[in-house]
Amino acid sequence: LPREKVDMDWDTFVAALDLVRFFVRQGTQTELSLTGIGESMLHPRFVEMVAESRAVIGMGRLLTITTNGLLLDDAMAEALEPFKPAIFVSLHRPEKAAPAMVAARKRGLLAGRNAAFADSAFNWAGHQENWTPMVSAPNIKCEFLNAGWCVVLVDGRVATCCLDADGSSVVGHVRDDPETLTLKPWGDAKIGCSACHMQVP
């Protein structure tokens, strides 16, 4: 996918949490997901990010992590345990996913597994055109547009869609006035909402 492989810098992360804090105060921030295209646990300050995120959203809101399991060992699970994230493990590498799931389950952190690439495949809103013939994901309503979810990209831009691999759905930046961030359908006939397996509400 056409995204540069970089880590979010700490200042951008703090600004993103300020945006989250605004929506927590508004009463509309019901959960937070620390995930993305790529492996979130590769970030050198990942455990700190989880801790800071939990401090902002409190213990009563869902904090979700997705991982391919390569870095989720007993030590990582132990470090994450105080913050009670809900961890989903991808089954792309079963031989790595199994021990990761054991480590997360032992700490009460395993929320589920992800085998969507095999049993609920999609084409990343047209970004993976070669997957289009294999799309088997259900034609559900897009929760990003329906519930007002957004994605913060690595550079702090705020996007409408988690499947937007090139920034086409950007509506602003984490340092913008939150009231100006309006999510909307995006893309053209080949990339974006029109090419997605989900329905625009």
Please tell me what each predicted stretch does.
Residues 1-78, 82-86:
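Conserved alpha-helical substructure of the radical SAM core
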Residues 31-36, 64-67, 90-91, 153, ...:
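Short beta-strand segments
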Residues 37-39, 68-70, 92-94, 118-121:
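Active-site beta-loop-alpha junctions enriched in small/polar residues
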Residues 72-75, 95-102:
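Short, charged/polar "capping" segments at the starts of alpha-helices
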Residues 84-95:
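Non-cysteine beta-strand/loop elements that form the S-adenosyl-L-methionine
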Residues 98-120:
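Basic phosphate/pyrophosphate-binding loop/patch that engages nucleotide-derived ligands
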Residues 115-131:
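Acidic/histidine-rich catalytic cores of soluble enzymes
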Residues 130-201:
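Accessory C-terminal segments flanking Radical SAM cores
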